[in-house]
Amino acid sequence: MKRFFSVISAVILIFSQSFSQITPVPNGRRVQVAILFDTSNSMDGLIDQAKAKIWNIINEMSGLRYQGQVPMIEIALYDYGNSGLSESEHYVRQQLALTTDLDLISQKLFSLTTNGGNEYCGAVIQKSLQDLNWSTNPLDLKMIYIAGNEPFNQGTIAYKEVCSTASGRNIYVNTIYCGDYDQGVREFWKDCATISKGDYFNINSNEAVVHIATPYDESINSYNDSLNRTYYGYGAIGQSKKSNQLMQDANAASESEAVKTERSIVKSKAAYSNESWDLIDAVDKGGKDITSMDDAELPTEFKGKTDEEKVALLEEKKGERERYQKKIAELAVERQNYITAEKAKRTDLSKDDFGTSVNGSLMKRAKEIGYQKENESTDTPK
């Protein structure tokens, strides 16, 4: 009997070591991004562009490295200018504090609705500066993106003072004006960006995002379906979070196959981590020991098994997940090469939209403080 338990202990020890060896260890660096959307009546097109580009943006962010290591990606979401919001709060609402839960970010974005109101840019920027747990480390990348189409100086909160405060905390405020470039300048959108050392963009928010279909999309999304079957929700929130994972796949697919493909690629990367509800990620991150968990907390597939059987099944499913992630990552490289070649042939893809504005400024600022963009072919599965 002693020998039997020794064997189990050895298997568990080896399995635990294998998890620690294959998991990219964040080096303490963070990439923090707060997105502030005008949700007044005229901004439906802006929200549509964001839905179409959110996974492309996250893919760009997840390719950043600092001294070869993977930074933590945190995203926050606010909306402002909606008449359904509280006047006493300057028509500003926090949808989501800084979080690493990428499915939740998608859920909140797809739930946004528009309604006429007063757009107070200074107020929503101030709110994000006050509410969020911004890093104080100058090596962490901290970005605010505010998008809208009304004069920037509306409301009682002085935008100049707020943008200056952001600059003093090494937080770049980037402004995206939905309309004519010069009109945005006249309405002070460029001024805010200049004060905070951020970037100013203008976009046509009513223009649909153009996606390039590739021969690799179908295969990538097929592997994503297989990847989903390696996720096992545990504890009180496990099942609802698993359901939300599938719902956000569906939301992405409702935009286009290309958008779903971008999401599938994100799910092959270290940035897509779900240790709060997925059993494999929970053990992978070191916070859970499957042999000490109650059966009631475990997903159905793991109930009633011996410790040795639980560890063996977890190892099997972890291996399956890594294989699917690797396949997706390999195809993602081929897909990107195809897209790059197609872009070189076409002239209809040169205009800025919400996604290109965010990606361009984010990569520029990241490089300025020492981040590099790692080729996706070398991105290590989480």
Locations of regions flagged by a protein language model:
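Bacterial Sec-dependent N-terminal signal peptides
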Residues: 1-24
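Divalent cation-coordinating acidic motifs and surrounding scaffolds
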Residues: 21-207, 214-217, 285-295, 301-303, ...
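Glycine-rich, Lys/Arg-enriched anion-binding loops that position phosphate/diphosphate groups
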Residues: 193-194, 198-261
